[in-house]
A protein has these predicted regions:
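GH16 jelly-roll
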Residues: 1-111
Length: 111
């Protein structure tokens, strides 16, 4: 799950792997009107056949990637919690910007 500073209400479900990283990730998006002012539940379901991204009570994923022998989805992954700004993904930073906060209530992993 990624947020861009210049599009704060658009949620990106993104997978980075060989050939799909940097400026060419495998990503899907959804929009939440209050993404920066309310807590939300972000969910990733990683099954043997696919990885799917959900937010809040969605019953249909906003992004899903099927597994194949060419993809590294049968190996361990890292969960990255990141508050990044600027660059090619985040866009230019307002010169009047002084600070921001990323609040995480909890992280739960099931196996």
């Amino acid at each position: 799950m990624e947020h861009k500073g210049n599009e704060p209400n658009i949620i990106h479900g993104t997978l980075h792997y060989p050939g799909r990283s940097g400026g060419n990730p495998n990503t899907g998006t959804t929009t939440i009107a209050n993404a920066t002012s309310e807590f939300h539940v972000y969910k990733v379901i990683w099954s043997p056949t696919k990885i799917s991204f959900y937010v809040d009570d969605q019953t249909t994923p906003y992004h899903s990637v099927d597994n194949s022998n060419a993809l590294p989805f049968n190996h361990n992954f890292f969960l990255i919690m990141n508050c990044a700004m600027g660059g090619t993904f985040g866009g230019s930073i307002d010169p009047n910007f002084t600070q921001a906060t990323m609040e995480v209530d909890y992280i739960r992993v099931y196996r």
